[in-house]
Protein backbone atom coordinates (compact mmCIF):
# COMPACT_ATOMS: atom_id res chain seq x y z
CA UNK A 1 0.00 0.00 0.00
CA UNK A 2 1.33 3.38 -0.96
CA UNK A 3 0.66 6.82 0.46
CA UNK A 4 0.89 10.30 -1.07
CA UNK A 5 0.04 13.86 -0.15
CA UNK A 6 -1.13 17.00 -1.94
CA UNK A 7 0.89 19.51 0.07
CA UNK A 8 1.78 22.28 -2.45
CA UNK A 9 5.10 22.97 -0.68
CA UNK A 10 6.45 19.52 -1.62
CA UNK A 11 4.33 18.63 -4.65
CA UNK A 12 5.99 17.28 -7.77
CA UNK A 13 5.52 18.70 -11.24
CA UNK A 14 2.59 16.29 -11.49
CA UNK A 15 0.77 18.10 -8.67
CA UNK A 16 1.14 15.40 -6.03
CA UNK A 17 3.96 14.49 -3.70
CA UNK A 18 5.07 11.14 -2.43
CA UNK A 19 4.98 10.88 1.37
CA UNK A 20 8.56 10.50 2.69
CA UNK A 21 7.83 7.11 4.26
CA UNK A 22 6.72 5.78 0.87
CA UNK A 23 9.77 6.83 -1.14
CA UNK A 24 11.04 3.23 -1.31
CA UNK A 25 7.85 2.18 -3.11
CA UNK A 26 8.14 5.18 -5.43
CA UNK A 27 11.74 4.30 -6.27
CA UNK A 28 10.87 0.65 -6.91
CA UNK A 29 7.92 1.65 -9.11
CA UNK A 30 9.95 4.03 -11.24
CA UNK A 31 9.77 7.63 -12.35
CA UNK A 32 6.29 7.23 -13.82
CA UNK A 33 4.41 6.70 -10.53
CA UNK A 34 3.39 10.32 -9.86
CA UNK A 35 2.44 10.79 -13.51
CA UNK A 36 0.36 7.59 -13.55
CA UNK A 37 -1.44 8.55 -10.33
CA UNK A 38 -2.22 12.01 -11.70
CA UNK A 39 -3.53 10.49 -14.94
CA UNK A 40 -5.87 8.29 -12.88
CA UNK A 41 -7.21 11.38 -11.08
CA UNK A 42 -5.24 11.16 -7.84
CA UNK A 43 -5.05 14.49 -6.05
CA UNK A 44 -3.72 13.53 -2.63
CA UNK A 45 -6.88 14.67 -0.86
CA UNK A 46 -7.38 12.99 2.51
CA UNK A 47 -9.16 9.66 2.13
CA UNK A 48 -8.85 9.40 -1.64
CA UNK A 49 -7.85 5.91 -2.80
CA UNK A 50 -6.29 5.10 -6.18
CA UNK A 51 -5.35 1.58 -7.32
CA UNK A 52 -2.63 1.18 -9.92
CA UNK A 53 -1.03 -1.96 -11.42
CA UNK A 54 2.53 -2.82 -10.48
CA UNK A 55 5.50 -1.63 -12.49
CA UNK A 56 9.25 -1.48 -12.13
CA UNK A 57 10.62 -3.76 -9.43
CA UNK A 58 7.52 -3.61 -7.21
CA UNK A 59 6.71 -7.19 -6.16
CA UNK A 60 3.08 -6.55 -5.20
CA UNK A 61 0.47 -7.03 -7.94
CA UNK A 62 -1.18 -3.69 -7.11
CA UNK A 63 -0.08 -0.42 -5.53
CA UNK A 64 -2.80 1.37 -3.58
CA UNK A 65 -2.22 5.09 -3.10
CA UNK A 66 -4.12 6.78 -0.28
CA UNK A 67 -4.29 10.55 0.07
CA UNK A 68 -3.15 12.12 3.32
CA UNK A 69 -4.13 15.68 2.55
CA UNK A 70 -1.59 17.51 4.72
CA UNK A 71 2.10 16.65 4.75
CA UNK A 72 2.04 15.77 8.45
CA UNK A 73 -1.35 14.26 9.27
CA UNK A 74 -2.33 13.70 12.90
CA UNK A 75 -2.65 10.11 14.15
CA UNK A 76 -6.38 10.09 13.33
CA UNK A 77 -5.55 10.94 9.71
CA UNK A 78 -3.11 8.02 9.59
CA UNK A 79 -5.70 5.72 11.18
CA UNK A 80 -8.26 6.63 8.52
CA UNK A 81 -5.72 6.33 5.68
CA UNK A 82 -4.66 2.84 6.82
CA UNK A 83 -8.28 1.75 7.12
CA UNK A 84 -9.09 3.09 3.64
CA UNK A 85 -6.06 1.33 2.16
CA UNK A 86 -6.88 -2.03 3.75
CA UNK A 87 -10.54 -1.83 2.70
CA UNK A 88 -9.41 -1.02 -0.86
CA UNK A 89 -7.28 -4.18 -0.76
CA UNK A 90 -10.26 -6.44 0.03
CA UNK A 91 -9.92 -9.71 -1.80
CA UNK A 92 -6.13 -9.77 -1.43
CA UNK A 93 -4.42 -12.16 0.98
CA UNK A 94 -1.98 -9.65 2.45
CA UNK A 95 -0.97 -6.01 2.37
CA UNK A 96 2.12 -4.05 3.39
CA UNK A 97 1.57 -0.48 4.53
CA UNK A 98 4.24 2.11 3.72
CA UNK A 99 2.71 4.77 5.95
CA UNK A 100 4.39 7.21 8.33
CA UNK A 101 4.91 5.12 11.48
CA UNK A 102 8.04 6.58 13.05
CA UNK A 103 6.66 7.01 16.57
CA UNK A 104 4.63 4.73 18.82
CA UNK A 105 1.57 6.99 18.40
CA UNK A 106 1.83 6.80 14.61
CA UNK A 107 2.42 3.05 14.73
CA UNK A 108 -0.64 2.60 16.96
CA UNK A 109 -2.76 4.72 14.60
CA UNK A 110 -1.64 2.89 11.45
CA UNK A 111 -2.05 -0.54 13.06
CA UNK A 112 -5.50 0.32 14.45
CA UNK A 113 -6.65 1.67 11.11
CA UNK A 114 -5.40 -1.40 9.28
CA UNK A 115 -6.85 -3.98 11.68
CA UNK A 116 -10.14 -2.14 12.20
CA UNK A 117 -10.42 -1.64 8.43
CA UNK A 118 -9.88 -5.35 7.82
CA UNK A 119 -13.19 -6.19 9.49
CA UNK A 120 -16.12 -7.40 7.41
CA UNK A 121 -19.38 -8.91 8.60
CA UNK A 122 -20.66 -11.44 6.09
CA UNK A 123 -22.41 -14.04 8.25
CA UNK A 124 -25.91 -13.45 6.88
CA UNK A 125 -24.95 -12.73 3.28
CA UNK A 126 -26.57 -15.36 1.13
CA UNK A 127 -27.28 -13.72 -2.20
CA UNK A 128 -24.35 -11.33 -2.18
CA UNK A 129 -21.78 -13.67 -0.62
CA UNK A 130 -20.19 -14.48 -3.97
CA UNK A 131 -19.88 -10.80 -4.87
CA UNK A 132 -18.43 -9.94 -1.46
CA UNK A 133 -14.63 -9.71 -1.38
CA UNK A 134 -13.12 -11.13 1.81
CA UNK A 135 -11.05 -8.76 3.94
CA UNK A 136 -7.26 -8.81 3.94
CA UNK A 137 -5.95 -11.64 6.15
CA UNK A 138 -2.43 -10.37 6.90
CA UNK A 139 -1.15 -6.83 7.41
CA UNK A 140 2.49 -5.75 7.64
CA UNK A 141 3.43 -2.22 8.68
CA UNK A 142 6.79 -1.19 7.21
CA UNK A 143 8.45 0.82 9.98
CA UNK A 144 11.87 1.53 11.43
CA UNK A 145 10.37 0.56 14.80
CA UNK A 146 10.10 -3.10 13.77
CA UNK A 147 12.71 -4.31 16.29
CA UNK A 148 11.68 -1.99 19.13
CA UNK A 149 10.24 -3.88 22.15
CA UNK A 150 7.91 -1.02 23.07
CA UNK A 151 6.60 -0.93 19.50
CA UNK A 152 5.97 -4.68 19.65
CA UNK A 153 3.92 -4.11 22.81
CA UNK A 154 1.89 -1.45 20.98
CA UNK A 155 1.14 -3.86 18.13
CA UNK A 156 0.20 -6.65 20.56
CA UNK A 157 -2.16 -4.29 22.38
CA UNK A 158 -3.80 -3.16 19.13
CA UNK A 159 -4.22 -6.78 17.98
CA UNK A 160 -6.05 -7.57 21.23
CA UNK A 161 -8.34 -4.56 20.87
CA UNK A 162 -9.01 -5.34 17.19
CA UNK A 163 -9.84 -8.98 17.95
CA UNK A 164 -12.28 -7.84 20.65
CA UNK A 165 -13.78 -5.20 18.37
CA UNK A 166 -14.37 -7.75 15.60
CA UNK A 167 -16.00 -10.11 18.10
CA UNK A 168 -18.31 -7.39 19.42
CA UNK A 169 -19.27 -6.28 15.91
CA UNK A 170 -20.24 -9.83 14.99
Task: Write out the residue ranges for each language-model feature.
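Glycine-/small-residue-enriched capping loops at alpha/beta junctions
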Residues: 1-170
